[in-house]
């Protein structure tokens, strides 16, 4: 089996689970994954605020009956998703939220946008 990058494994997993649309903000933590969404048949729908991405994933789920997926940047980006994810939780919508984390060697050192997730 050929070796994959973490981004390739992430995109392959999303495609294997039938994900066709992902809502989120394009950012440095996901740049390499963004390049391989389209070849995998995944459409990235950009938003201007992570809260909108979470609400859009919830709405997508409610209308389509499939899982909604949103991406938030680490730290403050993911905290912006809380309201939309709470709405999805109470509506019993199958929404998946994905966020990066500070690299293992940098955890606890106050890295860029590090937050206790």
Identify the function of each model-found stretch.
Residues 1-117:
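N-terminal alpha/beta PP-like core and its mobile active-site loop of ThDP/TPP-dependent enzymes
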């Amino acid at each position: 089996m050929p070796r994959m990058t973490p981004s390739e494994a992430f995109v392959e997993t999303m495609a294997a689970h039938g994900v066709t649309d992902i809502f989120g903000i394009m950012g440095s933590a996901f740049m390499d994954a963004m390049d391989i969404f389209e070849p995998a048949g995944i459409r990235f729908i950009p938003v201007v605020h992570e809260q909108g991405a979470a609400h859009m994933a919830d709405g997508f789920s409610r209308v389509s009956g499939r899982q909604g997926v949103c991406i938030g940047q680490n730290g403050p980006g993911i905290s912006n998703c809380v309201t939309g994810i709470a709405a999805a939780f109470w509506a019993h919508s199958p929404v998946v939220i994905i966020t990066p984390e500070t690299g293992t060697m940098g955890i606890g050192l106050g890295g860029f946008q590090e937050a206790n997730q």
